A protein has these predicted regions:
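Structural motif
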Residues: 8, 42-43, 68
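Active-site segments that bind and position negatively charged phosphate/pyrophosphate groups
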Residues: 139, 143-209
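Short glycine/serine/threonine-rich phosphate/pyrophosphate-binding segments
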Residues: 47-54, 75-76, 192-193
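ATP/NTP phosphate-donor binding region
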Residues: 1-39
Length: 209
């Protein structure tokens, strides 16, 4: 298959999740003659996934994209569910769209290179999910904290799979967050406030946890 590819990147972190960056990405796509047959590959953490998904949702009124999350938090949370968007000066994730990825590819090799703070960032999100929906998973996560810190692949794989099962089950019933899906926002009201007050220096998982 003779596909033409090119790479677009932007500075890491929540402060890049802006209209300015979105416009930059869209303008680069236009310069490269991207059409409705274009496929966006979101290779990165949650911010990359959110941005790529929102661009995909709005570019030429919608083009496909796939998620390739490279952080534990993105693997277990933001890559699944179709929530995309950007932040505003007032609040987080206030402009966006529900736009489902065509595929999600999770490669545990990415975890090997993550710093401990990023591992814990995702771990806290898994704990949050388990508190709301799976007591057994909560005890497993609690019992295996040291294994998580040591990047034990078998333990992390189990946590990711079980966390995704929780989220997938809820999203399948309530894709647009009108009812059951709101439970996934547990801890987010306070968490988003803490992130905002820290000028997004505090990671999402830590704020929620």
């Amino acid at each position: 298959y003779n596909a033409r590819t090119f790479l677009l990147s932007f500075p890491a972190g929540e402060t890049s999740k802006t209209q300015k960056i979105k416009t930059f990405l869209e303008e680069q796509m236009l310069k490269n003659n991207c059409g409705r047959d274009t496929l966006i590959i979101a290779l990165g953490g949650g911010v990359v996934g959110d941005m790529a998904g929102f661009v995909a949702a709005t570019y030429m009124r919608g083009i496909p994209y796939v998620q390739v999350p490279t952080t534990l938090l993105a693997m277990v949370d933001s890559s699944l569910g179709g929530k995309t968007g950007i932040d505003t000066a007032q609040w987080k994730n206030m402009i966006g769209a529900f736009w489902q990825p065509k595929k999600i590819f999770i490669d545990l090799d990415f975890i090997k290179n993550l710093p401990l703070e990023q591992i814990l960032n995702g771990y806290f999100e898994i704990v949050k999910m388990s508190i709301t929906s799976n007591k057994k998973l909560f005890y497993f996560a609690e019992k295996n904290l040291r294994a998580v810190q040591a990047k034990n692949v078998a333990v992390l794989k189990h946590l990711i799979i079980e966390g995704l099962k929780i989220k997938a089950r809820i999203v399948e019933k309530d894709e647009k967050e009108n009812d059951d899906r709101m439970i996934l926002n547990f801890g987010h009201t306070i968490g988003h406030t803490l992130e905002k007050l820290s000028n997004y220096q505090l990671m999402h998982g830590y704020a929620v946890g």
